[in-house]
């Protein structure tokens, strides 16, 4: 049985937190303990939303689930926080893209099924990304979608040598390369001509960006 659900609405998508308030009402009606945490601060409305808003980091302890209200960007933002605590994320789509969301706004009533455990948790591969220079890690993070290496502001192609633990994979000359997880295969990688992977595939997609040649 769920002991605590965190409702995380994106205030730029859920104006006045209308959808989150309705979700809270539904969960309260089935006696599902819940708190509301806003992951993005809305500078235009700093005074609150008529709800008891709690600090997200403080409420993560003991949480059984995070419900994200927004688009894929909201889910991506929360996924890194959730992964460190092994907390599943349920997405309610309020954005223009909702590849990762399981529910649409019109399906909010189904949240009442959570206390009856009428749901399954699906594991998703994440990328552990590090930038190493001269043997020193200067950046490290988790990514649910993809990691991208590009030429940036340089107005010429770059040459990349891509290797795995087994050795050389391929060389790319072009604008860069995308390394996408199965979840990320429907995003930037797909737009760059990469294939779509099933979300449970144990592998990644390496997609060159505007390649001049593959060798």
Report each predicted region and the residues it spans:
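Gly/Ser-rich helix-loop-strand patches that form or flank binding pockets
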Residues: 77, 81-95, 99
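Catalytic core of DAGKc-family lipid kinases
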Residues: 96-175
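Short glycine-rich anion-binding loops that position phosphate/pyrophosphate groups of nucleotides
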Residues: 11-12, 72-74, 97, 183-185
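Redox-cofactor binding/interface segments in oxidoreductases and associated redox assembly factors
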Residues: 7, 68, 179
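Short glycine/serine/threonine-rich phosphate/pyrophosphate-binding segments
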Residues: 16, 73-78, 185-191
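Short, well-ordered beta-strand core segments
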Residues: 66, 89, 177-178
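ATP/NTP phosphate-donor binding region
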Residues: 1-65, 77, 105-122, 131-141
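Gly/Ser/Thr-rich active-site loops/lids in small-molecule metabolic enzymes
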Residues: 170-215
């Amino acid at each position: 049985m769920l002991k605590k659900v965190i409702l995380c609405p994106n205030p730029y998508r859920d104006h006045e937190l209308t959808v989150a308030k309705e979700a809270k009402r539904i969960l309260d009606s089935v006696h599902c303990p819940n708190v509301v945490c806003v992951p993005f601060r809305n500078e235009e409305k700093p005074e609150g939303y008529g709800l008891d808003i709690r600090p997200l980091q403080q409420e993560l302890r003991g949480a059984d689930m995070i419900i994200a209200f927004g688009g894929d960007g909201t889910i991506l933002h929360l996924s890194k926080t959730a992964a460190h605590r092994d907390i599943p994320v349920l997405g309610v789509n309020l954005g223009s893209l909702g590849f990762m969301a399981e529910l649409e706004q019109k399906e909010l009533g189904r949240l009442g099924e959570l206390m009856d455990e009428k749901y399954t948790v699906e594991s998703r591969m994440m990328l552990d990304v590090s930038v190493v220079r001269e043997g020193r890690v200067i950046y490290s993070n988790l990514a649910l979608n993809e990691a991208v290496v590009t030429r940036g502001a340089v107005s010429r192609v770059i040459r990349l040598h891509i290797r795995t633990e087994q050795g050389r994979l391929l060389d790319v000359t072009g604008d860069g390369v995308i390394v996408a997880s199965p979840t990320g295969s429907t995003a930037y990688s797909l737009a760059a001509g990469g294939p779509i992977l099933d979300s449970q595939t144990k592998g990644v997609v390496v997609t060159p960006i505007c390649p001049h040649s593959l060798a």
